């Protein structure tokens, strides 16, 4: 099956990334170290090997410390900007401003590694070591000194250490991670948290209290209490383009008019947001299969997705179409994680993804039959 055809034409829903990058970086670092030191071990002899070890240690320590100082200087620039907003953003707390600006991942490892590399740097730059590293050993033979300071083998080894090993170690220590300040700036600038916020709002503002009561509302409605082929779940419709007509029967998603509105359940009454006994009811639909046998279910669109659609067509547009497509996947994944984490909601819903060019009746019939098999219907 082509990826574009998966999930009823909705497309592939990517899995969450696993945190395997540090493992791959560790393997890469080990390989680089082995290659660098093996290459010089093969091409050098006697005291040259000791000088090579000091030279490589000195080169790497210097490169790492240079990067660390540069990163700290960059964070100082960020702090200078945050200090201008210390009253409005941090309630005048200098400590909070410093913590958000100078926060690093893997703090303990960073401290130990920095201390270690500083010791190596000093040791490599001692009178005996530095002279052999930078100036060459005065007692070495001329051809040995030349090979040590300007030979291709030495230059190649230093290149491997500086260009390959340092970035891997920097990544492992979390120095490339964004600070909390930068994450906040990115979210404010590019609306990166839109889908997550919509999913949480949908859950706390609606699904959290209607899903646990769904079956009770069906049982209270005499018209639907004894219906056969009634899968007692809420089927939440998620079209890939985030758009739909207000009515399901006869819409573009129901070209053959196979979906029929049968009525509403008895309402759930809940005082909320200052509205006394607000009513929450659900619409029940009938869908006929190829044998003209009726199936019944509760369907409704994930209404927060209309916000993503409106943002993608607004002028000036806050989201491009590509960003909207990415956000709907984030919404789907986040909503599924939230609902699966709530035991009261488990087994009471189905997320139905589909492409606008699919017949919703066919999509729903497959879902209904699969759900009936799952519950042993």
From Swiss-Prot:
Residue numbers binding 3',3'-c-di-GMP: 206, 272, 278, 300-303
Molecular function, one GO term: 2',3'-cyclic GMP-AMP binding
Places the protein is found: Endoplasmic reticulum membrane
GO terms for biological process, alphabetical: activation of innate immune response; autophagosome assembly; innate immune response; positive regulation of macroautophagy; positive regulation of type I interferon production; reticulophagy
Membrane topology summary: Multi-pass membrane protein
Keyword Nucleotide-binding applies: yes
Membrane spanning residue stretches: 22-42, 58-80, 102-122, 155-175
Entry keywords, A to Z: Autophagy, Endoplasmic reticulum, Membrane, Nucleotide-binding, Transmembrane, Transmembrane helix
Cytoplasmic side: 1-21, 81-101, 176-377
Binding site for 2',3'-cGAMP: 206, 272, 278-279, 303
Membrane topology, Extracellular segments: 43-57, 123-154
Gene Ontology cellular-component annotations: autophagosome; endoplasmic reticulum membrane
Main localization of the protein described in the UniProt heading: endoplasmic reticulum
InterPro entries recorded: STING (IPR029158), STING_C_chordates (IPR047191), STING_C_sf (IPR038623), STING_LBD (IPR055432), STING_TM (IPR055434)
Function in brief: Sensor of cytosolic DNA from bacteria and viruses that promotes autophagy. Acts by recognizing and binding cyclic GMP-AMP (cGAMP), a messenger produced by CGAS in response to DNA in the cytosol. Following cGAMP-binding, promotes the formation of autophagosomes, leading to target cytosolic DNA for degradation by the lysosome. Exhibits guanine base-specific ligand recognition. Binds 3'-3'linked cGAMP, 2'-3' linked cGAMP and 3'-3' linked c-di-GMP with much greater affinity as compared to 3'-3' linked c-di-AMP.
Self-association and partners: Homodimer.
Recorded family membership: Belongs to the TMEM173 family.
Protein name: Stimulator of interferon genes protein
Species for this entry: Nematostella vectensis
